[in-house]
Amino acid sequence: MNYKISIRYDGSLFYGWAKQPQKRTVQEHLETVFKTIFKINDIKIIGSGRTDRGVHAYEQVFSVNHHQLNYEPQVIYQALCSQIDPDVQILKVQSVHDTFHAQHDAISKTYQYIINDYEFDLFKHNYEYFIHQKINDQKLLEALELFVGEYDFKSFSTSELPLTTRKINWVKITRNTRLEIYINGNGFLKNMVRMIISACIDYVFNKISLTQIKTLLTNPKKGASVKLAPPCGLYLYKVYY
């Protein structure tokens, strides 16, 4: 059977989503749990996409399909919850059609980035980006809105993929004490969100102009924008199907 499973995780102690030799990753941990519970050595899970080291997820989705997995979703859910590490939370398990693919069937994703420009909080430093200067929210939004639309994001990625065109559907910001930035798109390249956030922050503090940002979008060049916002403030917020 094929299952669609939604999870949440604290990325602080993970080396990202994808499996790496001798590293603790979310994918590796989940596959180990499946192997331990269900005694299936060739199990393979497919995520909606990768997150980097230190990046968190409010909702990541993965699919797992194996002929030896033939259980009710609630049984899978309870079994995973009993064995999963405390920095991963199982949100939902659904049985789906055999053709469902967590990555290929995703329509869009929303990322959230949290900035604290108010007061340093020791116990949240792994979960937000602390900036010592106050951010002008309207100015930040002005820069963010430049990215809405379909562009070649080669300037805003470290990806080695040959095709780097993506579409940003919408952006928004909310403010309580902390600043929360939301970016929705049909797909994201490696480090793309963090580079976008970094460029927008640089604009707020007059280190780069809107014209320079537009040039990076209209004349894409790999390595043109090399600054990255820290991973601690970034969350994969929701995956849409």
Swiss-Prot record:
Substrate binds at Y111. The keyword Cell membrane does not apply. The active site is at D52 (nucleophile). Disulfide bonds: none annotated. Keywords: Isomerase, tRNA processing. Its EC number is 5.4.99.12. Belongs to the tRNA pseudouridine synthase TruA family. This is tRNA pseudouridine synthase A. It comes from Ureaplasma urealyticum serovar 10 (strain ATCC 33699 / Western).
